[in-house]
């Protein structure tokens, strides 16, 4: 079992915060500081976004964070260089669109990851049918390709998506982009329970989670949550103490 999956399988109430690399007043020089803060608060893993000019899955908060990072000339190459010098016991997960990886060179990308604490990849615009672009390069590495599964996807398709998954399953709680609040289906709990029965891999719920009420709800029917827009917004507004308190409360339900 790879590190990311082992880490998330060991406990309930997993909390995975999302941050945008380079969205800091000191740009990438602030990345280590943010990772250490999130680790010390009790995060199970940390998702790190790569800024991209056409972020189809990102809501306005994360899209603006990406634009701020791009304005500081943050790139995938610079992010990977920064991560090489960061030591953390918490597995990192890179969230990137496929184009930056393709431009960087897939083999070079994976080789660079091996010099970092990155243990997982989320590529939202890479469908299951195209995973062969990535998987042959990470099969024997301690790196997982994490699938996103919409809870409105037919069960037959969900089975296809999770059959050989590693790390965790990213359950998309709403239709649309990240950060979209109060749009949860009444059937969501049932859908999460159904998805969890299809796999032994931890299922984490994300998209639109912004309150402790949301966290408590999803911790009951999945292995934990991924919180992006709220974390990105609070960090941008220099509310680090609020972030720490939110994570500490979230993991102690």
Swiss-Prot record:
Active site location: 47, 58
Gene Ontology MF, one: tryptophan synthase activity
Listed EC numbers: 4.2.1.20
Top enzyme category: lyase
Record's keyword annotation contains Nucleus: no
CDD domains linked: Tryptophan_synthase_alpha (cd04724)
A GO term from the CC aspect: cytosol
One Pfam family recorded for the sequence: Trp_syntA
Catalysed transformations (reactions): (1S,2R)-1-C-(indol-3-yl)glycerol 3-phosphate + L-serine = D-glyceraldehyde 3-phosphate + L-tryptophan + H2O
UniProt key word Oxidoreductase: no
UniProtKB keywords: Amino-acid biosynthesis, Aromatic amino acid biosynthesis, Lyase, Tryptophan biosynthesis
PANTHER family (UniProt xref): TRYPTOPHAN SYNTHASE ALPHA CHAIN, CHLOROPLASTIC, TRYPTOPHAN SYNTHASE, ALPHA CHAIN
HAMAP family in alphabetical order: Trp_synth_alpha (MF_00131)
Family: Belongs to the TrpA family.
Descriptive protein name: Tryptophan synthase alpha chain
Organism: Lactococcus lactis subsp. cremoris (strain MG1363)
């Amino acid at each position: 079992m790879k590190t990311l999956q082992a880490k998330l399988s060991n406990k309930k109430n997993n909390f995975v915060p999302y941050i945008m690399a380079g969205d800091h007043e000191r740009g990438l020089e602030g990345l280590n500081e943010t990772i250490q803060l999130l680790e010390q608060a009790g995060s199970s893993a940390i998702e790190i976004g790569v800024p991209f000019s056409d972020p189809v899955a990102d809501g306005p908060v994360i899209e603006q964070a990406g634009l701020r990072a791009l304005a500081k000339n943050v790139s995938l190459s610079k992010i990977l260089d920064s991560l090489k010098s960061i030591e953390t016991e918490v597995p990192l997960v890179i969230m990137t669109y496929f184009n930056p990886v393709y431009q960087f060179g897939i083999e070079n990308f994976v080789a660079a990851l091996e010099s970092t604490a990155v243990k997982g990849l989320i590529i939202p615009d890479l469908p299951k049918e195209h995973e062969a672009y990535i998987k042959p390069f990470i099969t024997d590495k301690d790196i997982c390709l994490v699938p996103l599964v919409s809870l409105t996807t037919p069960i037959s398709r969900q089975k296809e998506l999770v059959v050989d998954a590693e790390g965790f399953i990213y359950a998309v709680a709403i239709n649309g982009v990240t950060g979209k609040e109060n749009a949860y289906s009444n059937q969501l709990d049932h859908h999460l329970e159904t998805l969890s029965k299809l796999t032994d891999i931890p299922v984490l719920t994300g998209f639109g989670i912004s309150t402790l009420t949301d966290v408590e709800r999803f911790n009951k029917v999945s292995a934990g949550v991924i919180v992006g827009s709220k974390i990105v917004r609070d960090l941008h507004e220099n509310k680090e103490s609020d972030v720490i308190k939110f994570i500490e409360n979230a993991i102690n339900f």
